[in-house]
């Protein structure tokens, strides 16, 4: 039976779940995740304790509980459950209060209840920009892009662009490199004024073939030799043009995005 892990939060639980994933990924073990968001009352806290204790009895072992509960009373209630409770706020906020000699706001859901803030608006603008400039569908306002990702079809440009926009508020456009570009031996014309914003994504040809076969099985588009040709040409072009690039083959979207931000010296826009 898989160990049970509860993600308990007074908000969406995204922060707690992200932290839990980072910690649990260090162990060669699968876990059963139970998400318990929006614990914004004493009654809900007691109900959560009942769920945790039921899981302990059913599993025959204590669950693991990651919490980001700001309300002190609710937090103490959950801590009385039959579980290993890992309190993120107490572990990190209290030492920071002492170090900074400041009192934290202790406001529930502060991280994600930000629809009226400039940071939130920046993120929404970035998402809209990335959607409008996906796969080269628009050349308008490319000068406003923070970064323009280039690469062959299905090399990871779209998910990376959207992740940069959603997570960091970065205006990320993406533009495909196609066989016609390789025949000319030049970057697509609309990209010429924006060379300083370009960053390339490549991928292993066989992995690219697998991905394309899911979309167009048996086609020339997905054939290994065609994928090999496109990747070789794309990488050669990026080297000629002095465009920084990386292989997305064995990297997560998070790793790709972080590398791009570091390579182009772009500071995170949202926090």
From Swiss-Prot:
Bifunctional serine/threonine kinase and phosphorylase involved in the regulation of the phosphoenolpyruvate synthase (PEPS) by catalyzing its phosphorylation/dephosphorylation. The lineage of its organism: Bacteria, Pseudomonadati, Pseudomonadota, Betaproteobacteria, Burkholderiales. ADP binds at residues 151-158. The keyword Transferase applies. This is Putative phosphoenolpyruvate synthase regulatory protein. Its EC number is 2.7.11.33, 2.7.4.28. It catalyses: [pyruvate, water dikinase] + ADP = [pyruvate, water dikinase]-phosphate + AMP + H(+); [pyruvate, water dikinase]-phosphate + phosphate + H(+) = [pyruvate, water dikinase] + diphosphate. GO terms for molecular function: ADP binding; ATP binding; phosphotransferase activity, phosphate group as acceptor; protein serine/threonine kinase activity. It comes from Burkholderia mallei (strain ATCC 23344). Keywords: Kinase, Nucleotide-binding, Serine/threonine-protein kinase, Transferase. Pfam families: Kinase-PPPase. The keyword Kinase applies. InterPro entries: Kinase-pyrophosphorylase, PSRP. Belongs to the pyruvate, phosphate/water dikinase regulatory protein family. PSRP subfamily.
């Amino acid at each position: 039976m898989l160990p049970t892990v509860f993600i308990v939060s007074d908000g969406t639980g995204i922060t707690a779940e992200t932290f839990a994933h980072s910690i649990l990924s260090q162990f060669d073990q699968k876990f059963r995740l139970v998400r318990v968001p929006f614990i914004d009352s004493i009654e809900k806290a007691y109900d959560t304790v009942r769920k945790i204790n039921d899981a302990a009895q059913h599993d025959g072992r204590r669950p693991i509980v990651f919490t980001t509960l700001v309300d002190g009373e609710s937090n103490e209630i959950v801590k009385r459950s039959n579980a290993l409770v890992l309190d993120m706020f107490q572990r990190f906020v209290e030492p920071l209060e002492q170090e900074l000699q400041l009192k934290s706001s202790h406001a529930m859901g502060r991280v994600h209840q930000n629809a009226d803030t400039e940071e939130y608006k920046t993120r929404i603008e970035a998402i809209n920009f990335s959607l409008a400039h996906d796969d080269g569908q628009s050349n308008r306002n490319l000068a406003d892009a923070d970064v323009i990702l280039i690469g062959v079809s299905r090399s990871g440009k779209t998910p990376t662009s959207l992740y940069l926009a959603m997570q960091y508020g970065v205006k990320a456009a993406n533009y495909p490199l196609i066989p016609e570009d390789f025949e000319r031996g030049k970057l697509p014309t609309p990209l010429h004024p924006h060379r300083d914003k370009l960053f390339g994504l490549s991928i292993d040809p066989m992995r690219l073939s697998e991905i394309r076969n899911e979309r167009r099985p048996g086609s020339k588009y997905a054939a290994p030799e065609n994928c090999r040709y496109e990747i070789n040409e794309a990488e050669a072009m990026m080297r000629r043009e002095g465009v920084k690039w990386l292989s997305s083959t064995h990297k997560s979207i998070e790793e790709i995005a972080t590398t791009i931000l570091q390579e182009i010296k772009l500071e995170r826009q949202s926090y």
